[in-house]
């Protein structure tokens, strides 16, 4: 069943073509500081289109015939932000021109999980940890079957990898997936700018024929607010989650001796969420974001899970309508985007945060017990607790800014969290939230 028309169409997030490029000659690096190309101006934004080509053999750490790794390379890329600043950098991965929203992530590890998190669709992820690529990548740590982010921004690209599970380098991984990346740029200065000014639209380009002013105009005219990004990351048809949960993933076993059938709405769901639910004894049916609530309820599930996902919850009214038709009928658990959709379905409002929460070190307080957990978070929007109807309880708050981080409505048999209890990457402090969902389904059977 097709979804109702959204407020705006989803952007094309992948490059249109890929081809080899020659290796760069040894040269002295160009300074990576910003320079201003024009005054800051406000204005509407429209969707930009990227054409990019894969890079071959020009990354930091290129291996030459004598087997020596040589990390030097010319600065061949630019990141132009909508505030007029231009940041020189060196490219790796794909080349071309790409537009997206620049956000920073404070996680020290887990870059592969971040790369494959669908919630980053349409965004450039800037890693505040300066050393990235040290452990390479492997097929086990992916959170989805592809990368949806616009690009990766890092300070230092490791010239070697060291991990027993590594199967390829970060450079090779991005080339195969046609994802742009830049390094040797002042990520700390960019992070400070985002912290002060908020998330900024940026254009990343290796195309030397484009002027800084042209790239700046692209950044100012691009739009992400009000765009339905979920339709570009959700699955095409329902399926049963059949991934065997290895002992390595089961850091806690035996949480429940009962089996529960859970229908999970895929708004950009992460694999480790499904693994954690499976570890708690759940049989999971995953359905697309636009799947009718009536068909889900006909399956007579023990519970319904609303997943994480990218973008603006106000841009997907069809998803809000689905949540409204399901809550109160079966136990419901929502994470991140699911939490925001539940808030809207209950009559509340959501708003865009200044620079969002992205990282694995956010303290949250459970107001019911006073317990403080360190959580993994990834969202640019939040629920306004003042807009919620009577009876809905705010159960958790983010201790950095006191924003709403959790909801509970016992009458409707629902709970939701603004952060990721599966924590991939991140600490496992909040894994007990899955146990709460299990208890809700168990009590509903009585």
UniProtKB/Swiss-Prot annotation:
Main subcellular location of this protein, as a coarse class: plastid
Residue span(s) of domain Glutamine amidotransferase type-1: 261-446
PROSITE patterns noted in UniProt: GATASE_TYPE_1
Molecular function in Gene Ontology: ATP binding; carbamoyl-phosphate synthase (glutamine-hydrolyzing) activity; glutaminase activity
Family: Belongs to the CarA family.
Subcellular location: Plastid, Chloroplast
Catalytic activity: hydrogencarbonate + L-glutamine + 2 ATP + H2O = carbamoyl phosphate + L-glutamate + 2 ADP + phosphate + 2 H(+)
Low complexity composition-biased segments: 1-32
Protein name as catalogued: Carbamoyl phosphate synthase small chain, chloroplastic
Pfam families (UniProt xref): CPSase_sm_chain (PF00988), GATase (PF00117)
S-S bonds: none
GO cellular component, one term: cytoplasm
Keywords, in A-Z order: Amino-acid biosynthesis, Arginine biosynthesis, ATP-binding, Chloroplast, Glutamine amidotransferase, Ligase, Nucleotide-binding, Plastid, Pyrimidine biosynthesis, Transit peptide
Functional summary from the UniProt entry: Small subunit of the arginine-specific carbamoyl phosphate synthase (CPSase). CPSase catalyzes the formation of carbamoyl phosphate from the ammonia moiety of glutamine, carbonate, and phosphate donated by ATP, the first step of the arginine biosynthetic pathway. The small subunit (glutamine amidotransferase) binds and cleaves glutamine to supply the large subunit with the substrate ammonia.
Transit peptide residues according to the UniProt entry: 1-50
Pathway listed: Amino-acid biosynthesis; L-arginine biosynthesis; carbamoyl phosphate from bicarbonate: step 1/1; Pyrimidine metabolism; UMP biosynthesis via de novo pathway; (S)-dihydroorotate from bicarbonate: step 1/3
NCBIfam families in the record: CPSaseIIsmall, PRK12838.1
Annotated spans, Disordered: 1-44
GO biological processes: 'de novo' pyrimidine nucleobase biosynthetic process; 'de novo' UMP biosynthetic process; glutamine metabolic process; L-arginine biosynthetic process
Domain of life: Eukaryota
HAMAP family assigned to the protein according to its UniProt record, in alphabetical order: CPSase_S_chain
Assembly information from the UniProt record: Heterodimer composed of 2 chains; the small (or glutamine) chain promotes the hydrolysis of glutamine to ammonia, which is used by the large (or ammonia) chain to synthesize carbamoyl phosphate.
Entry-linked SMART domains: CPSase_sm_chain (SM01097)
Residues at the catalytic site: 336, 420, 422
Record SUPFAM superfamilies: Carbamoyl phosphate synthetase, small subunit N-terminal domain, Class I glutamine amidotransferase-like
Lineage: Eukaryota, Viridiplantae, Streptophyta, Embryophyta, Tracheophyta
InterPro entries: CarbamoylP_synth_ssu, CarbamoylP_synth_ssu_N, CarbP_synth_ssu_N_sf, Class_I_gatase-like, CPSase_GATase1, GATASE
């Amino acid at each position: 069943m097709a979804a109702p028309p959204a407020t705006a169409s989803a952007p094309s997030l992948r490059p249109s073509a890929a081809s080899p490029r020659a290796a760069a000659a040894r040269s002295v690096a160009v300074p990576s500081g910003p320079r201003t190309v024009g005054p800051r101006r406000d204005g509407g934004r429209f969707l930009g289109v990227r054409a990019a080509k894969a890079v071959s053999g020009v990354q930091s750490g290129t291996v030459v015939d004598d087997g020596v790794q040589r990390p030097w390379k010319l600065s061949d890329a630019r990141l132009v932000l909508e505030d007029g600043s231009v940041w020189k950098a060196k490219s790796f991965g794909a080349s071309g021109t790409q537009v997206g929203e620049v956000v920073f992530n404070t996680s020290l590890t887990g870059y592969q999980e971040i790369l494959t998190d669908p919630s980053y669709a349409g965004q450039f992820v800037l890693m505040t940890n300066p050393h990235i690529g040290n452990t390479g990548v492997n097929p086990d740590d992916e959170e989805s079957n592809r990368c949806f982010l616009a690009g990766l921004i890092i300070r230092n690209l490791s010239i070697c990898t060291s991990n027993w599970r590594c199967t390829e380098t970060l450079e090779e991984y991005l080339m195969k997936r046609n994802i742009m990346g830049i390094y040797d740029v002042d990520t700390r200065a960019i992070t400070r700018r985002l912290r002060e000014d908020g998330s900024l639209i940026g254009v990343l380009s290796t195309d030397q024929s484009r002027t800084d002013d042209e790239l700046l105009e692209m950044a100012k005219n691009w739009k992400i607010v009000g765009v339905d990004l979920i339709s570009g990351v959700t699955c095409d048809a329902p399926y049963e989650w059949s991934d065997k949960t290895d002992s390595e993933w089961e850091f806690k076993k035996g949480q429940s001796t009962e089996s529960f059938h859970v229908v999970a709405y895929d708004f950009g769901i992460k694999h480790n969420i499904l693994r954690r639910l499976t570890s708690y004894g759940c049989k999971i049916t995953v359905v697309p974001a636009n799947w009718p609530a009536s068909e889900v309820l006909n399956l007579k599930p023990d519970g319904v899970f609303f997943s994480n996902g990218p973008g603006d919850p106000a841009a997907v009214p069809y998803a809000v309508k689905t949540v409204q038709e399901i809550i109160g009928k079966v136990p419901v658990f929502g994470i991140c985007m699911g939490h925001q959709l539940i808030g809207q379905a209950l009559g509340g409002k959501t708003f865009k945060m200044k620079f969002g929460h992205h990282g694995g070190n956010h303290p949250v307080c459970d107001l019911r017990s006073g317990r403080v957990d360190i959580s993994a978070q990834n969202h640019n929007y939040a629920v306004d607790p003042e807009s919620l109807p009577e009876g809905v309880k705010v159960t958790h708050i983010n201790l950095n800014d006191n924003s709403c981080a959790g909801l509970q409505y016992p009458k409707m048999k629902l709970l939701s969290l603004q952060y990721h209890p599966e924590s991939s990457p991140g600490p496992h402090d909040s894994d007990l939230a899955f146990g709460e969902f299990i208890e809700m389904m168990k009590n509903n059977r009585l």
